[in-house]
């Protein structure tokens, strides 16, 4: 297993500077990570710097609340892809899920999948805000909507991935949909737990530390 190719090297803090973006790009090239995951404002720059490197550009949509309208999420997706994004990590309408408005949740995801035009879509369900049954339902809706991954967390809601949630999500979606674990994956031990639970992608700012087997000091 090439551990580096499971990692989306992530920097989503609102105060991220161009210098910090340069650093994660350089690290992603050095370690040959799967992608860098950055906010939409940095996508075009990252895509230019990563051209022909083999490292993909991932960005976030409706982030971190998931509470923007479906049309807004679809436009954000189209704009991101136009700017060079390869992969889209969207946040579901969490309130709609909790209301039981499952059609709204699924249609929201479907609109992003359609706007992504074949690009990989990962669906953040924010597990820390959900109970067991809601995690199952959100995972089912992600699969039904045609997305490629179901993802645990934004890292902005006070909690991140757990191996238990990753396993539950993987058991729910089966072989057709992959699972991304993100939020609080800070070292090689955390990384291995998530992979053993069924994750095939890891979102972390600690990619370098994971590869070096070191503890990181960041929550995302």
Swiss-Prot record:
GO molecular function: deoxyribose-phosphate aldolase activity
One Pfam short name: DeoC
Coiled-coil annotated spans: none
InterPro entries in the record: Aldolase_TIM (IPR013785), DeoC (IPR011343), DeoC/FbaB/LacD_aldolase (IPR002915), DeoC_typeI (IPR028581)
Membership in a protein family: Belongs to the DeoC/FbaB aldolase family. DeoC type 1 subfamily.
Purpose of the protein: Catalyzes a reversible aldol reaction between acetaldehyde and D-glyceraldehyde 3-phosphate to generate 2-deoxy-D-ribose 5-phosphate.
The protein's name: Deoxyribose-phosphate aldolase 2
Gene of this entry: deoC2
